[in-house]
Amino acid sequence: KRGGAPAGDEPPRAGERLALVLEDEEDVRQTLCEQLHQLGWLTLETASGEEALQLLEASPDIALLISDLMLPGALSGADVIHTARRRFPALPVLLISGQDLRPAQNPALPEVEWLRKPFTRAQLAQALSAAYARI
């Protein structure tokens, strides 16, 4: 079962789940993956929206999608999230960006949990819990 949350809407425990990280800036992606590892997650990472969708199709173990909003290429982070939500409605999603992500400022954004960069590991952990609570 993809993306199912345990009782109490708490994220899975250490080493049990795999997160797909879609971020085009390598240093930001590495830092985010390090924070996820410290929180007990395994990670797959990519800078491409197209590759992220391929990985989601090919890897049923992915239990969380974290995507940057602004990406190079044809697909934005919002495009990837919209497609992923259609294909995998039970997959928790976290949208990250340096931009203001409040819905009033961005009515076209997908209705998912979001986190504004830069963020701390504690803020990331709280956002992950909130992303699981939305499913």
Task: Indicate residue ranges for each PLM-predicted region.
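Charged docking surfaces used in two-component/phosphorelay signaling
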Residues: Q30-Q38
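Short amphipathic alpha-helix used as the core "switch/output" element in two-component signaling
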Residues: E50, Q54, A78-L91
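Conserved phosphotransfer microenvironments
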Residues: D68-H82
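Acidic di-acidic motifs
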Residues: E23-D24, K117
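Disordered, acidic interdomain junction associated with two-component signaling
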Residues: K1-L20
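Acidic, metal-coordinating helix/loop segments flanking the phosphotransfer/catalytic sites
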Residues: E45-L64, P72, A104, Q123
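C-terminal output helix
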Residues: F119-Y132
